[in-house]
Amino acid sequence: MLSFVDTRTLLLLAVTSCLATCQYLQSGSVRKGPTGDRGPRGQRGPAGPRGRDGVDGPMGPPGPPGSPGPPGSPAPPGLTGNFAAQYSDKGVSSGPGPMGLMGPRGPPGAVGAPGPQGFQGPAGEPGEPGQTGPAGPRGPAGSPGKAGEDGHPGKPGRPGERGVVGPQGARGFPGTPGLPGFKGVKGHSGMDGLKGQPGAQGVKGEPGAPGENGTPGQAGARGLPGERGRVGAPGPAGARGSDGSVGPVGPAGPIGSAGPPGFPGAPGPKGELGPVGNPGPAGPAGPRGEVGLPGLSGPVGPPGNPGTNGLTGAKGATGLPGVAGAPGLPGPRGIPGPAGAAGATGARGLVGEPGPAGSKGESGNKGEPGSVGAQGPPGPSGEEGKRGSPGEAGSAGPAGPPGLRGSPGSRGLPGADGRAGVMGPPGNRGSTGPAGIRGPNGDAGRPGEPGLMGPRGLPGSPGNVGPSGKEGPVGLPGIDGRPGPIGPAGPRGEAGNIGFPGPKGPSGDPGKPGERGHPGLAGARGAPGPDGNNGAQGPPGPQGVQGGKGEQGPAGPPGFQGLPGPSGTTGEVGKPGERGLPGEFGLPGPAGPRGERGTPGESGAAGPSGPIGSRGPSGAPGPDGNKGEAGAVGAPGSAGASGPGGLPGERGAAGIPGGKGEKGETGLRGDTGNTGRDGARGIPGAVGAPGPAGASGDRGEAGAAGPSGPAGPRGSPGERGEVGPAGPNGFAGPAGAAGQPGAKGEKGTKGPKGENGIVGPTGSVGAAGPSGPNGPPGPVGSRGDGGPPGMTGFPGAAGRTGPPGPSGIAGPPGPPGAAGKEGIRGPRGDQGPVGRTGETGASGPPGFVGEKGPSGEPGTAGAPGTAGPQGLLGAPGILGLPGSRGERGLPGIAGALGEPGPLGISGPPGARGPPGAVGSPGVNGAPGEAGRDGNPGSDGPPGRDGQPGHKGERGYPGSIGPTGAAGAPGPHGSVGPAGKHGNRGEPGPAGSVGPVGAVGPRGPSGPQGIRGDKGEPGDKGHRGLPGLKGYSGLQGLPGLAGLHGDQGAPGPVGPAGPRGPAGPSGPVGKDGRSGQPGPVGPAGVRGSQGSQGPAGPPGPPGPPGPPGVSGGGYDFGFEGDFYRADQPRSQPSLRPKDYEVDATLKSLNNQIETLLTPEGSRKNPARTCRDLRLSHPEWNSDYYWIDPNQGCTMDAIKVYCDFSTGETCIQAQPVNTPAKNSYSRAQANKHVWLGETINGGSQFEYNVEGVSSKEMATQLAFMRLLANRASQNITYHCKNSIAYLDEETGSLNKAVLLQGSNDVELVAEGNSRFTYSVLVDGCSKKTNEWGKTIIEYKTNKPSRLPFLDIAPLDIGGADQEFRVEVGPVCFK
């Protein structure tokens, strides 16, 4: 049956089945419902369709030769098999089907008895190759073969005996930190010191004991951050923390050494018959043989006209299965399959003993910042910080309490004149006094208003020349001038670097056919040609006359061993032959099975040292080495998880004060300390905002009275004078009530740091703080000990065919094997020379129907027939377990648009949710419950078949899929010997599902049974994981009406809103046993969370549901009585569902193809160029997209793939640096780094557009891991600057330095691992012309590339210039 199923379907379904099985194992057992009673026997079905052609009957006795009949008309084409091989309960037939069509013409009949001795005929055609002769004697030893390629590295040898103690080794690398010691016992608290008496004010004394903390003042505004202090000296290395919790899975480690070979697999299935090989070259003509034994019947005459058809033979019994063929040759090694899914995390292994100190690794990349260390002790006083910018004015604080009354101030200045008193009553008129003295001049009157503008004055005389002004600031650059005329052509530039090879050009047009040559001279007569191969077997000739027995001819020489012929049909058992003479010693047979292990041989001489093998597994820990010297302090490790509390340790001595730590976070408020001494006076703060007005001061004391003058005459009141100048301030009045605090003044400059106070007693340990957030993933840890072996995984998918492995070393010749079985029949030989035509025999009488001859050789394959109609939909397969959640597949190819279905009933609008922030895309949510079925859309037209895709890799075996279209009929197999007809056995207990048996004889139809009781509803199943989103199916045909089932348990409420009660169930199929619940359908779009509404009224009845699946669940048994036979070709049997299945399979196939064969595009990048070359060997070198770190393709990078060398090349950005002339800070005889010093810290970068430098660094790190070789070149363009060899001195002292990626310096001479080579050196002498030197560095340590910087030495002169051109870095 399987031969009719589309192989792709099986592969895809196999994957689904395997995943489902895994999921089933994980999800725990599912309670299976009780098996229902067996239903009654169904009614007698309608007459089945026509049965298949019966098997040919046994051979009849040979008939007499028939008279030649007239030529028959061409036979109609046979029916195309549309075998749907399905079990059916309905296939009870009322008897044998109608007689089948006439079968194909049978093979020629058996050869008749030998006729009488004929005349000596002409030499017959060469006979078929004889059976394989006995093995010849052992030949002489062949010449030694070429040395085989190196074999795979052997397993690591056993450890040798301990050698003599060597000399004192070099200083070892620092060992790993020891395990943490137990915590020391807490020491006794020291006695509190006595408080010192205050001394006389003198030189500032040592700081006193800290005073008690004062009451906490109001929190000051946060000061501006000071400048970052200098990095303190590194503290001593901390004790090793306890082992942290298991970190996230690190990136895949380097590929380990090859494991030991697995156990031999079970013998594979018999391979298909290989294609007929091309005939081998003809061997040299042998010597003419002696006269052979009398030949068989003479040359076959032309076949007679076909006889009349014989009677149809009785149906033969099914033949016994044939003998299993010999196992096929092992196929070539498959290409490594994709990496299997990560196994479950093994249990944590025990900590192994410390291994011996490893060799020093290369400097690692800079690690992520460690977690914040504990706060160090206060550092020494820093330098005075810069004055901060003034802060914003603070809000006014509350009014403070009234201050104490101040002591009386010093005597104040006289107060201002008091206000005039109230006017007294008018006095009596006095007597006229004498004339007074002229009074002083009155106060100047108020200035008059400005007069009108006077007439313009005459121009003044010119002034003296003023001093020359200061030079003004440089003006802004002027507008660009017009472009100047085109200058003369410059000298021809130097040749650029060799570019990447261009893509391969298209094939040229085929050349014109040449003219016909002159006919050649006739050649000399050739040697006799070799015997031709057998001609095709002719039809049997007429029965010859009985010949007389010829004389025994001499034995001919043994012929060449013929090729094994194809397997012939089973002949009748021959009579036992006479015992033959013992044969000569045969040729060496094939290697026998592996013998038992021999005793160990003597130790051989030491061979030459072999190549370095791949790293072996870790050996047992060696003895402890001598203690190495203390290593350099390592970088702080990331904080480990808290270990269990240790025993208290002894009190340690006071440590040396550490360097100043970085500013820690604000600690919790401490207890109140003792009052400290006054600090040094700070710099006065800025003047605050004016306070509120004070209360009026007391009146000042009256001044001393002056001598009274004579009374003057009463003057008339003058005009009111202007306000006089303010009088002097009066004495200070008493303190007014405290005003509102002024606005906060600007922050004063930071005072000098006070001296450190004495460290207070250690506070009690605070409660453990909450766990901080997880730090960033630490750097990749060293490789952990191997976990325990995981459970045996499921068989991986067969890998793609790998390249053939290297030839192994030729083994010793095996012992002679037993004589091989008779070989299969060799391929048909070339046609022999045409024999002379025999005379036409007389027409014999018509023969009886002959026994069926053996099957003829299969004819050449006919032209493919037209595709048969779609087979019937197969019976539903076993319900698969829900598959595990697959990774999100790539978007499938858009299917053809179906016609839109009618609109469904619109749901009630949900409440508007608040707008959420745009989140990162979440993982697919759990699937909601399936919504109600919409009205069925009209069927869309089926799409045309797409082009066949590339062949995918072999998938996991799938569950049985729907029956595919019938394949073309295979060639007739050879008929085996007829078996005896067995008696009908008793019915046995139900066994496990076996393979499909041969068709049994039809039994009589039973009476119709009674309808069975309704089955119990099954238990509610676990919610399945979401499957791949299927294509929306077309509405199925309605099933036969059944009884309504009980209401199932309600599913979990989906998030999409209130769901009404389920509508009435549609008609169901015939009741079967309750099956396992099916997988949940595709998830709908997740709606916003609706509030739980009241249950709505029952909806209208839905459309009829699709037919129910056949019951049986996992109690699947083949209980059908018969196969359902072929459907007639004309009946339309293609159901609409088949289109959906076919489209889904095509989509899955395309997605898997895409995963397995990357295209090098941005959406489907490869991992490296090597993967692209393996997937598309016909592609040319060009730019492609790759994604070395896999995962999301958003950070894929565009690289140049050089398929001729297998390299992945990444360009620097930018490639050229601008030319640099004299660099003023260049010191004599000192290299200057271009990026770090001259360009202000910008090193060479290798960015790709759209990818950040961090992402690019990650991709480069993965490229280094994936490659085992790297190379790069850099071109130094110079003018009067030496780049490598100084031709004047012949030294390399002025050669440039290069900085690699791991901070290694690459030099011109020295250690060969770190020296670069020079391809072109045009900068060896100073010629006032531009030249260039091309430097190349190749390494098998990809971590050293790409170049990050270059440091020339010979620069800085007024006539010196240089620039750099960075070539691409290529990984392989």
Swiss-Prot record:
Positions of glycan attachment: K183, N1273
Binding annotation for Ca(2+): D1187, N1189, Q1190, C1192, D1195
Compartmental location: Secreted, Extracellular space, Extracellular matrix
Modified residues (5-hydroxylysine): K183
Signal peptide: 1-22
UniProt biased composition (Pro residues): 59-77, 1095-1107
Modified-residue entries (Allysine), positions: K90
Domain of life the protein comes from: Eukaryota
Domain Fibrillar collagen NC1, chain residue ranges per copy: 1139-1372
GO annotation, biological process: blood vessel development; bone mineralization; cellular response to amino acid stimulus; collagen fibril organization; collagen metabolic process; extracellular matrix assembly; protein heterotrimerization; regulation of blood pressure
Pfam family, one: Collagen
Disulfide bridge map: C1169-C1201, C1209-C1370, C1278-C1323
Biased composition (Basic and acidic residues): 147-161, 744-753, 1011-1022
Tissues showing expression: Expressed in kidney glomeruli.
Biased composition, class Gly residues, residue ranges: 544-553, 640-649, 781-790
Propeptide: 23-85, 1126-1372
Any single GO CC term annotated in Swiss-Prot or TrEMBL for this entry: collagen trimer
Post-translational modification: Prolines at the third position of the tripeptide repeating unit (G-X-Y) are hydroxylated in some or all of the chains.
Record text on subunit structure and interactions: Trimers of one alpha 2(I) and two alpha 1(I) chains. Interacts (via C-terminus) with TMEM131 (via PapD-L domain); the interaction is direct and is involved in assembly and TRAPPIII ER-to-Golgi transport complex-dependent secretion of collagen.
Domain notes: The C-terminal propeptide, also known as COLFI domain, have crucial roles in tissue growth and repair by controlling both the intracellular assembly of procollagen molecules and the extracellular assembly of collagen fibrils. It binds a calcium ion which is essential for its function.
Name of this chain's protein: Collagen alpha-2(I) chain
